[in-house]
Amino acid sequence: MINLLNITYPEFESLIVTTLQEKTYRAMQIWQWVWQKQITDIESMTNLPQKIRASLTALIKINLPEIVTIQQSSDGTKKFLLRLSDGALIETVLIPSIDKAGNIRITQCLSSQVGCSMGCTFCSTATMGFIRNLTAGEIVSQVLLAKLHLNDNKPDKPIIRNIVFMGMGEPLLNLTELTRALHILHSEKGLNFSARRITVSTCGIKKGIQALSENGLAFLALSLHASNQELRSTIMPKAAKWDLKELIDTLKNYSLKKREKITFEYLLLGGINDSPEHAKELAKLITDIKGKLNLIPYNPAQGQPYLKPTEENILKFQKVLWSKGIVTILRKSKGQDINAACGQLKTTYLSQSSSTIY
């Protein structure tokens, strides 16, 4: 059987027309039942004749992960621990904000891998090691589950407004499945996320950056975290195999849409990369790129050797960047009290469980 969540709309339409010998509008009806109304029970798709429902039941399945736990932070952030069909565990996070009209808007942080191979020394996920890539269906199912949880079924007034690939894993090391997932997210007949509402964050995988530049399916964020190659080699040893200056040159040739900017992410580690000298070096590195910089104070995590920077050092760092003409945003981390903030995603459930899933 075919997992409907794992295929794009053109593939699904072809399946309905060629295999079931039905009209294309039937494909659209089914697709909208799943992706807009979050109906995953085929028998509940009431505008389909019984014959089609029976044929569809024999042809496709809709595999959703199991929700193991949901934790809610004092700031409203929610972290979902999900169990996939093979028992693997991943996390996805819902981050709330309030728009100008006073409505709640959610940014969802998605995982792209089980674990991560990059080994960044400040990241809790890195301690899991790399287990496997997620399929496109496993990526987009995180969104479907979140929409079900939120009762987010009004396409003209969505609650989940933005998607960020900043969860577990390096998205651009899972480029094939990531690209398929982006096409599913984009489908105007379904979730209808435009490129400007999706951000893919990477440690700096050049091949993947070039692919994202060509396909234009999402905005780009670069996890920089260091102002020079030597420092990056220390705190991001595997990512540092891509020379920093070559990486910046790649970004200078990145194809940007109108009003699009590259986002640079810089995690401030107390006493490591947070001096005014680092700020000057950083400004020089990125000054020729159309972008903006997110400053992220480090969130202390169990077992990690780093400290949170002082408020004084944070402000000094930001002041230097502003003086050099770098648009700099001090990002407030949410979900710290449930280990859902930047760098804290890790399936701690494993260590709390007496059973082993592998």
Curated annotation (Swiss-Prot):
Chain positions recorded as [4Fe-4S] cluster binding sites: C116, C120, C123
Principal localisation: cytoplasm
Cofactor: [4Fe-4S] cluster
Domain of life: Bacteria
Cystine residue pairs: C109-C342
PROSITE patterns with a match to the protein in the record: RADICAL_SAM
Radical SAM core domain residues: 102-337
GO MF terms held by the record: 4 iron, 4 sulfur cluster binding; metal ion binding; rRNA (adenine(2503)-C2-)-methyltransferase activity; rRNA binding; tRNA (adenine(37)-C2)-methyltransferase activity; tRNA binding
EC number, UniProt record: 2.1.1.192
tRNA processing as UniProt keyword: yes
Protein's cellular compartments: Cytoplasm
Annotated catalytic residues: E91, C342
Binding residues for S-adenosyl-L-methionine: G169, E170, S201, S223, L224, H225, N299
Any Pfam family hit: Radical_SAM
Catalysed reactions listed for this entry: adenosine(2503) in 23S rRNA + 2 reduced [2Fe-2S]-[ferredoxin] + 2 S-adenosyl-L-methionine = 2-methyladenosine(2503) in 23S rRNA + 5'-deoxyadenosine + L-methionine + 2 oxidized [2Fe-2S]-[ferredoxin] + S-adenosyl-L-homocysteine; adenosine(37) in tRNA + 2 reduced [2Fe-2S]-[ferredoxin] + 2 S-adenosyl-L-methionine = 2-methyladenosine(37) in tRNA + 5'-deoxyadenosine + L-methionine + 2 oxidized [2Fe-2S]-[ferredoxin] + S-adenosyl-L-homocysteine
InterPro entries per record: Aldolase_TIM (IPR013785), Methyltransferase_A (IPR040072), RlmN_N (IPR048641), RNA_MTrfase_RlmN (IPR027492), rRNA_lsu_MTrfase_RlmN/Cfr (IPR004383), rSAM (IPR007197)
Top EC category: transferase
Cellular compartments per GO CC: cytoplasm
Alphabetical UniProt keywords: 4Fe-4S, Cytoplasm, Disulfide bond, Iron, Iron-sulfur, Metal-binding, Methyltransferase, rRNA processing, S-adenosyl-L-methionine, Transferase, tRNA processing
Biological processes per GO annotation: rRNA base methylation; tRNA methylation
Known role: Specifically methylates position 2 of adenine 2503 in 23S rRNA and position 2 of adenine 37 in tRNAs. m2A2503 modification seems to play a crucial role in the proofreading step occurring at the peptidyl transferase center and thus would serve to optimize ribosomal fidelity.
Family to which the UniProt record says this protein belongs: Belongs to the radical SAM superfamily. RlmN family.
Protein's name in the database: Dual-specificity RNA methyltransferase RlmN
Organism: Lawsonia intracellularis (strain PHE/MN1-00)
Name of the encoding gene: rlmN
